[in-house]
């Protein structure tokens, strides 16, 4: 909770470092379960044995600028550039992940932002963290309820119902989507809407779009 409250005081370029820290503090048991499942599958484990893993490709994401509009790679580039995040500095400053699976999971955080369409707003970060570490688990819902609904009720009680609807939609929208096993590194030039279709993702609801847009760090 300390790191979450500090996020709103950080400069935008420094927030990835804080988010990486939060990712190490939640969902340890579920993280191990997901990791074991990933490594026990020959197809997904092989993704870590490549010369150009997802982490290697993401470390040079500025090359994605040349990709066609609407592709996963171009969407990643535009998202990472939106607040001029220094990706290399954020990773180096954090220093908490090891090579292999852990590095891939670090990059999956940004992939979730892009594929699910969540911004870097307070709500967007909460929804991304919840989706990442408690997919299909009610504890993830409880997390974004705490950081989103409770605070919003204190600031603007009339918006509580909309916030609740958005949180419910986040939970329903991510449940059962096996994004951990999807080879994003092989589909950087594919249209992002096709990827969403392949993952059987529902469209963002109006409630999610509204709350994500209006949920500021101030």
Located regions from the model:
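A cross-kingdom marker for long, charged
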Residues: 173-218
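Core of folded catalytic or high-affinity ligand/protein-binding domains
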Residues: 14-24, 31-190
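N-terminal mature-domain "stem" immediately C-terminal to a signal peptide or N-terminal signal-anchor/transmembrane
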Residues: 1-10, 20, 28
């Amino acid at each position: 909770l300390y790191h979450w409250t500090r996020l709103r005081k950080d400069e935008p370029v420094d927030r990835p470092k804080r988010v990486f820290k939060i990712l190490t503090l939640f969902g340890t048991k579920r993280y191990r379960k997901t990791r074991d499942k990933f490594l026990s599958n020959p197809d997904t484990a092989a993704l870590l044995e490549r010369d150009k893993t997802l982490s290697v490709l993401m470390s040079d994401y500025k090359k994605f600028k040349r990709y066609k509009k609407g592709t996963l790679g171009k969407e990643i580039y535009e998202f990472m550039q939106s607040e001029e995040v220094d990706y290399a500095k954020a990773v180096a400053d954090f220093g908490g992940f090891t090579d292999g699976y852990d590095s891939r999971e670090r990059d999956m955080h940004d992939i979730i932002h892009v594929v699910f369409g969540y911004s870097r707003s307070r709500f967007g970060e909460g929804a991304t963290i919840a989706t990442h570490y408690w997919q299909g688990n009610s504890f993830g819902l409880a997390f974004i309820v705490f950081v989103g609904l409770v605070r919003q009720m204190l600031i603007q009680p009339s918006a509580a119902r909309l916030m609740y609807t958005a949180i419910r939609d986040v939970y329903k929208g991510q449940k059962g989507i096996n994004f951990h096993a999807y080879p994003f590194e092989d589909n950087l030039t594919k249209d992002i809407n096709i990827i969403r279709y392949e993952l059987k993702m529902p469209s963002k609801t109006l409630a999610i779009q509204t709350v994500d847009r209006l949920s500021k760090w101030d």
